[in-house]
């Protein structure tokens, strides 16, 4: 039936993203361990490969504690409000020619608009927790998002002007001859601006003021535990992956590469990983 075919693509994309998030967290922990002369997660499964699954089960079974002074409706709703925009950004990303959920004519505008909506859930989490550290973290987040939004838009505007389209698939196809990152001066400047703005959007070093461990502990999520904490983590890493996909699509030719078109998603994932490493 027609309604079933409309659900298949979102279902597949969501499951792929959840799988990527699961093992990117493991990869990050492994990298951090190596940098500190440690082994990292190693006990669950061969070489610790099943550690993310064990962590997910642990979070699902943990008690859901709500602070006595919290604003319960806001506190409980915040993780979902935070997660939805982080997942919705994948709706317009084409992973290969004709392979995606919805290739909109205003794809880049949709991505920019939806990705900025995560601040609503983030602010709800800080406000609803009724915790001074969480609230201070959300206030910093609002200031930071106001700061990075304009550079992010200006950086994304360069590929849009070079391709002459807001449609993400058109931007990818316009790079068949030359990736936009290799355009003299303007391509490199736009890419550097995009990376810096994305680091700020993802709250990564040196823009991790939202959860500065030395003063704010876990930032806006300090009062969350169990499944709610897992949902917030899922949204945060999904946003990182989505921004990495967008960077590969805007500047690195997306799925264009040697070999048959069937290898397009492989090249796209490879460039996404390159962009992801720059975020860490």
Report residues per predicted region.
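Juxtamembrane/interfacial segments at transmembrane-helix boundaries in multi-pass membrane proteins
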Residues: 1, 97-110, 154-190, 261
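Alpha-helical transmembrane segments
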Residues: 9-17, 105-116, 180-199, 265-272
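Juxtamembrane inter-helical linkers in multi-pass membrane proteins
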Residues: 33-56, 141, 145, 204-229
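Membrane-interface helix starts
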Residues: 39-45, 62-77, 238-239
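Transmembrane alpha-helix boundary signature
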Residues: 63-68, 87-101, 123-127
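Mid-bilayer segments of alpha-helical transmembrane spans in multi-pass integral membrane proteins
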Residues: 84-91, 110-125, 146-164
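N-terminal cationic and glycine-rich segments that engage phosphates or anionic surfaces
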Residues: 90, 169-226, 230-236
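Conserved small/polar residues in nucleotide/adenosyl-binding loops
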Residues: 274-280
